[in-house]
Amino acid sequence: MIGQANRIAAAVSTACLAVLLAGCATVPTGGPTFEGRGGGAQGQVDTFTRLLPAGPQPGWGENALVRGFLKDLGSFEENHEAARLYMTEECADVWQPSDRVLVYEEMDAVRFDVETVEEERAARVRVRTPLYATIRPDGQYVPASPGEAIDVVFDLTKVDGEWRIANLPDTILLSRQDVDRVYRPLNLYYFNRDMSTLVPDPVFLPVSSAVNITEQLSQRLVTMLLDGPTDWLAPAVRTSFPAGTTATVEYSSGNVTVNLDHRAAAADPRRLFGMGAQLVWTLKQLPEIQEFTLRLDGEEVELPGVEDGVLQASSQEWNSVNPAGMTGSPRAYFLRDGQLWSLDVDQREALVPGAAGHGRILVEEHAVSLDETRVAGIMPDDDSVRVAPIAEDGEYTTVLQGGDYTSLSWDGYGNLWVVEDLSAEVAEAEREEDLADDTEPGDTAVGSTERRETDRGEKRQVTRLWLLAEDADPVEVHAPELAGVPVTELRVSRDGTRVAVLTGGADGGQVLVGRVVHGESTVSLQAFLPLARDLVTVTDLSWRGADQLAVLGQKERGAIQAYLVSLNGSGESTSAGAVTGSDMKTITAAPGMPLLSGTEEDTISSSSDRLMWRRAVEGTKPVYPG
């Protein structure tokens, strides 16, 4: 199984670290440098556009003062010094803004209602606007649910004839534009449950022009990494750092030195490798960092992957826990005449061995395990899910039967996830209720009708989710948030910690991402968050990387095309272009691989950049492993 392979690789890396620890005196002065960066959010990490606050102007009315305050609240310099100019002296001295930020779309969408009292010496301004998102104290950016709103009150008073704020909320209110300017989206990295693969935990970090941005971010990233994952991701991941571990972080001219305290110094080599991996992957997102030194309680430690003083971030040691969840160049798999073919990175096609490629059993949907040793298929003729080895003597074995199965996905542990559509059963049950006698002995027709309508008001389960581990009975996945929601697609992340689902009808719906939590004998999906909110419809989705989806969707104006969607929850979906002359029907993606799309003309197109899609092969429903 995949998990076993990764655990072996991790053990090898630990052994390397143990050898390196024995020779710490060989560490180059100043620490190793970073090479082979990858992953994470780089972009505008090391740049900053400073807001020049206007400050309160003489003669401003109540509305104008609060509006100006909200604009200047986007300046984080000197602990919101500009925003405090709008307050009374007493208020400015005691106001302590919280780490929670409420995000609204734009100032034009904000409503100000003014009530002036006490002979125009005191006033109250009520501020209301739709809530776009919340940045939680742990840094997570959480998109708002439909109908959520900001509704806060500012108390004003006159000071020397000018309005000033005397009382206000502790929560920061920022426009989306302010968030884009002040915050940097980055990842913290933790491990999945068997410590085989790193998992990104997207966070938003505020920056200020008063201190070197890389210095700010490196210190904040390490502190947050040691504090633990966001509340949302915490139940699904693990950390190598012992509880209570603290660190000092020093940055100078591209060199970061992290000194972990005695708790980390007592860790065994395997755990020490994990701590190093989490730090390396987290810090290498910052492009200004050229050298990294790790100390344990003051003693310098050599890290795996160091060659001539250069830390190779893409070395075998670090790649053993790569967040991508897979290494090398995986093949894609597609259907042609109901049989399975493979397509390698050079676009050479081949009929796969065994029953999947040469047998007489035709499949409707398919998914290939991450190690490319097994294929799962949905059989349209007998309502079953079957699995076959991808080998010359590989034959299909039925693993699930008797349902209307619609979607398949493999995780890195070798588990197969299956979506079962219960809508036909629900519709039949409702028809039977309609045909049933409205009355029972002692009932009135009105009473029984009201009772039936009450029963229907409860959510009926229209989707059932299954988890199939090798050589084990199927387990029904507990997903209460999806109980009454039709799920048309489910894709589990390759690290096994999150799922992306497509909800709605056959014409497209909403993208949600939830966490995967394993109990002793149960599996549950929890805390779903919306993604790709700028798309009016989405018809297919795939994991492109550990922190990004590829989807087929449509904006309010435009045709169906490919988009890239970040899991950090903010910003607009990025266009990945469209196939010319043919409607796109499916999409699949994998880390470092071209996007592939199946079209209405039973051809598969490929794209390595956003501007050009090329026809690759004849076939339908291409998928990468996963």
Curated annotation (Swiss-Prot):
Organism domain of life: Bacteria
Signal peptide: 1-23
Keywords attached to this entry: Cell membrane, Lipoprotein, Membrane, Palmitate, Signal
Lipid sites, type N-palmitoyl cysteine: 24
Cross-referenced Pfam families: Germane (PF10646), Gmad1 (PF10647)
Coiled-coil residues: none
Lipidation, S-diacylglycerol cysteine type: 24
Record carries keyword Cell membrane: yes
Biased composition (Acidic residues): 430-441
Family as reported in the entry's similarity comment: Belongs to the LpqB lipoprotein family.
Protein name from the UniProt record: Lipoprotein LpqB
Species assigned in the record: Thermobifida fusca (strain YX)
Gene: lpqB
